[in-house]
Structure formats: structure tokens, C-alpha cells
């Protein structure tokens, strides 16, 4: 950080300006980034409603005072730590605390704090900070955030060691029901105790996400784990605690969720596949060979084998989110798929009728699946 200089002075010294919104400069030799000290003033609602002052009169303390949390409001000069807001103490005590009431001027900071909490999962968000985050949630400012901006923070959170903390913090400050009402709706939704001793659908979802994060760093897996049971929130009350058909009813919820936050196609497609087919995988030992073939085809596994890998990680995570025991279904479905990958279909290619060729290939595949042992 550079204090006491202007953009013109930086350029005259040979620095190259690269920042569009903020004056950030590249050192002419080392290519290190240098930013001018700045302060901002709230001018309008939302994350972008600020004017900025980058003048040479801005002091370091003024710049740090406008930072979001104390552990981000420290600087170092000549090996001397400058810490006007006791960030070192909060770092030592593992506390995430806002610097000042200016925190509430930027609604994006609610998501940032939740993300920091999931990244540094042994840190605690200070109760005063939760309180001010709740004020932001109640102010209507969160609604000003674009779907793309929310997704950027959510995606970063999903790559942290424990993304479930991100959503728990948002729940605690009232932001979950505003930004992610589909997830918030899972709270208090009962499940059949025999299959879900862990509790309601929200508790189950967070546990599935935790297990998915232990098994994979893939964002496709983690997002699918988060959204796979959205349909349970709209199960008709008369059939609770059962959730017959929730996999189908959840598809439109996921479609809308993905559209709102501009999900990449790869993430959205995997979320939809896991939602639609996860129950079939759980009961794969009860399925006919033809239904297993239809499942593999529905996953588009023959063209994209990775789809099956991602799917099985998700279904195993779903299982571990309710019962902490083995999941042989994944191994069995993998064996079924392996039996088909190098299957000799020359008998079918001798036929002339395209429809009969297709029927013969299906018949050969079903016979191969039937030969796969179901004992584990």
C-alpha cells in the first residue's frame, strides 16, 4: 500500500495502472502490485453504491478503519506491525470481528464474513458482528446484490474446508432466508427416523455437504450435495415424514436456483443428475438390470464416464449424511458400468435395421449387467 501519493505521481515513477475501479499499479521491475490508500463514502444502496477518495491526504489509519474485519485491518512497515484495531488479538483468539459500524454499508460483507468463517473453520464470528450482519439482513440491502456476485462468494465458500459453516453463519444472521430461501425452507422438515436419525432435512443437507467435502474438492460434487434434497421442502404435508417423489419435485427448484445465480452448466447439470437419480442408486440392489442400464444412460455415463464418478461420490455422501456405514451400492454400480465399457457388440453391428441394432445392444448390455455379482 502506498500512502501520500497520487495516481499521476505513481505513473511518473514508472508504475503501470491496472485497476479499473481502484488505483492499483504494477512495479516497473518486480511487477508487484501497489495500491493507493483510500476511503469510501456510501452514496447509494448496494455493494457498488460508493464514491472513493484516493487523494494523497488519506492516511493509513483512515484506510484501515474502512476495512471489513480486524484481522484484515493490519499493515506492516519496516517490519513494524501497525494494528490500530487489535487485529492481532483477534487473530490469536480466533475471532472474526468487524472494525466499525461502517461494516453495514456494504451488504457483500455478510457473505465475506460467512466465507471467512468457513475458510478458518476454527474461528468464531463475534456476536456483535452477527448482530450487525442481522441488521444488514433486515435492511433490505442484501436484495441489491446480483446473482453473479452472490455466486462468486458462494463458489469461494464451497472450496473451503467446511462450506457448511458458510450457510450456518448466514442462517444465524438471517441472511439465509433472504438469499437462499430454498435452503432455509429445509429447516424443520421432518424425515423418517429409521432412515434419517440425524434429524430434519436441513441437518441432513449440512451433513451430506460435510461428507462430500471430505471425499472431493470438486465444486460439482459439493454443489450437488448441497442441493440434492431441495424437493423435500415442498413435500405435501399429508405424506410427511416420508418424501415420495422429492427427487422429481426438486428438479425445478434446482433449475431456478441455478438460473438465479448463473451456475456454470457443468455444476448445474450434475446437481440435476444427482437430484433425479440419487434414490435409484441407494436401492440399486433391488433394481432390474434394465433399470440399472437406464440409470447409467440417464447419467450419460457412456459418453462422459466422469459423470458416474461425480454421481457416486454424491450418493455416498448422501448415505454417510444419515448412516455412518459402508456403501456397497457405489462399487456395484461401478462394476456394472465396467462390464459394459468393453462389451463385444459385434453381434449387433451385423444387423441392418438401426432400430434392431439398438435393441440388440440394449439386450447385450442387460445380459452383461445380470452377470455382475450382487454379493459384497
For the regions a language model picked out, list residue spans one by one:
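Catalytic cores of the polymerase beta-like nucleotidyltransferase superfamily
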Residues: 1-376
Amino acid at each position: 500500500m502506498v500512502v501520500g501519493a497520487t495516481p499521476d505521481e505513481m505513473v511518473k515513477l514508472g508504475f503501470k495502472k491496472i485497476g479499473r475501479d481502484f488505483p492499483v499499479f504494477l512495479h516497473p521491475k518486480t511487477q508487484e502490485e501497489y495500491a493507493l490508500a483510500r476511503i469510501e463514502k456510501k452514496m447509494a444502496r448496494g455493494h457498488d453504491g460508493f464514491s472513493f477518495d484516493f487523494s494523497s491526504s488519506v492516511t493509513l489509519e483512515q484506510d484501515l478503519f474502512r476495512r471489513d474485519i480486524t484481522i484484515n485491518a493490519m499493515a506492516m512497515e519496516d517490519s513494524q506491525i501497525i494494528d490500530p484495531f487489535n487485529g492481532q488479538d483477534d487473530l490469536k483468539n480466533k475471532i472474526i470481528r468487524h472494525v466499525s459500524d461502517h461494516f453495514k454499508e456494504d451488504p457483500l460483507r455478510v457473505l465475506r464474513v460467512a466465507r471467512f468463517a468457513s475458510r478458518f473453520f476454527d474461528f468464531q464470528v463475534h456476536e456483535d458482528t452477527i448482530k450487525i450482519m442481522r441488521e444488514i439482513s433486515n435492511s433490505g440491502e442484501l436484495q441489491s446484490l446480483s446473482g453473479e456476485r452472490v455466486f462468486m462468494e458462494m463458489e469461494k465458500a464451497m472450496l473451503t474446508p467446511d462450506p457448511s459453516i458458510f450457510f450456518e453463519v448466514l442462517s444465524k444472521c438471517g441472511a439465509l432466508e433472504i438469499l437462499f430461501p430454498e435452503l432455509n425452507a429445509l429447516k424443520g422438515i421432518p424425515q423418517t427416523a429409521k432412515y434419517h436419525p440425524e434429524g430434519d432435512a436441513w441437518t441432513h443437507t449440512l451433513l451430506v455437504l460435510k461428507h462430500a467435502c471430505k471425499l472431493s474438492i470438486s465444486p460439482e460434487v459439493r454443489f450437488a450435495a448441497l442441493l440434492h434434497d431441495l424437493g423435500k421442502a415442498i413435500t405435501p404435508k399429508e405424506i410427511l415424514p416420508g418424501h415420495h417423489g422429492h427427487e422429481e419435485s426438486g428438479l425445478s427448484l434446482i433449475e431456478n436456483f441455478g438460473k438465479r445465480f448463473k451456475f456454470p452448466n457443468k455444476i448445474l447439470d450434475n446437481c440435476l443428475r444427482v437430484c433425479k437419480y440419487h434414490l435409484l442408486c441407494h436401492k440399486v440392489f433391488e433394481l432390474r438390470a434394465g433399470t440399472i442400464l437406464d440409470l447409467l444412460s440417464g447419467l450419460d455415463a457412456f459418453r462422459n464416464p466422469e459423470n458416474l464418478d461425480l454421481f457416486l461420490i454424491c450418493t455416498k455422501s448422501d448415505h454417510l449424511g444419515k448412516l455412518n456405514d459402508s456403501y456397497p451400492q457405489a462399487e456395484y454400480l461401478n462394476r456394472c458400468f465396467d462390464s459394459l465399457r468393453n462389451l463385444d457388440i459385434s453381434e449387433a453391428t451385423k444387423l441392418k435395421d438401426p432400430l434392431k441394432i439398438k435393441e440388440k445392444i440394449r439386450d447385450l448390455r442387460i445380459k452383461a449387467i445380470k452377470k455382475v455379482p450382487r454379493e459384497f
